[in-house]
């Protein structure tokens, strides 16, 4: 006889994971790399963090691999629990709503664009003698750019007036640091958030609005436009 009560929670968890496969595969990889960093010696840990960074040095040597690999590591392994919660609250909901490929496209573009733009600002600051040349080797890894983009997209999932309260909170969270000595990471977060907000056309609601506009234009009194 199969247990009913014990299998129900497991089934719900499995269904939740399957409904957002990209989020949970990504989270699994981050969990593994966090364990590697936590178990490594200090020297090996520093080497791995710098080698997998998308800083100026690594972008010049390994542009494609550094952009990809940097999104699978976090600098502080104990923060994995916080990131896991954020992945479930933000990424999983957005992936389930958009579909895996549109979600992946959005966060991928945001991660790459924010990384390249922020590192370009670092390079300009180094050339202008506002930052030391050692910043070419700065540790630049993490998942926060993707989270910022997904957080922007999540706004369109909420109905008014909650959407506007959420937007004000998110914009304040990522925008306030820009007013008080912003770092290159703060600027990257703002860029990623902006790209997430700009991805409205990828949402199901945008497609529904376009279909509704097409239906209205085809009704009597609203002939379709000439081409």
Residue ranges, per PLM feature:
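Actinobacteria-biased recognition of intrinsically disordered, low-complexity terminal regions
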Residues: 1-23, 202-227
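Aromatic-anchored segments of alpha-helical transmembrane domains
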Residues: 31-36, 111-120, 169-184
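N-terminal TM1-TM2 helical hairpin plus the immediately adjacent luminal interfacial "cap"
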Residues: 38-100
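Hydrophobic, membrane-inserted alpha-helices
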Residues: 66, 84-92, 147-153, 168-178
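Membrane-interface micro-motifs in multi-pass membrane enzymes
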Residues: 133-154, 188
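Loop-to-transmembrane alpha-helix initiation sites
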Residues: 181-196
């Amino acid at each position: 006889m199969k247990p009913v009560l014990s299998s129900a929670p497991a089934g719900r968890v499995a269904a939740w994971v399957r409904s957002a496969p990209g989020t949970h595969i990504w989270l699994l990889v981050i969990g593994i790399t966090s364990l590697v960093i936590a178990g490594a010696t200090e020297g090996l840990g520093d080497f791995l963090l710098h080698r997998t960074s998308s800083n100026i040095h690594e972008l010049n040597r390994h542009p494609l691999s550094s952009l990809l690999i940097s999104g699978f590591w976090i600098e502080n392994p104990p923060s994995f629990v916080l990131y896991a919660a954020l992945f479930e609250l933000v990424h999983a909901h957005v992936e389930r709503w958009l579909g895996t490929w549109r979600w992946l496209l959005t966060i991928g573009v945001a991660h790459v664009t924010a990384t390249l733009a922020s590192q370009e600002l670092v390079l300009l600051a180094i050339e202008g003698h506002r930052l030391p040349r050692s910043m070419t080797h700065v540790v630049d890894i993490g998942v926060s750019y993707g989270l910022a983009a997904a957080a922007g997209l999540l706004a369109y999932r909420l109905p008014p007036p909650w959407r506007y309260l959420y937007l004000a909170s998110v914009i304040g969270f990522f925008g306030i640091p820009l007013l008080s000595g912003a770092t290159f990471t703060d600027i990257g977060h703002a860029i990623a958030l902006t790209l997430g907000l700009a991805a409205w056309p990828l949402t199901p609601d945008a497609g529904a609005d376009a279909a509704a506009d097409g239906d209205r234009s085809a009704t009597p009194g609203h002939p379709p436009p000439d081409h």
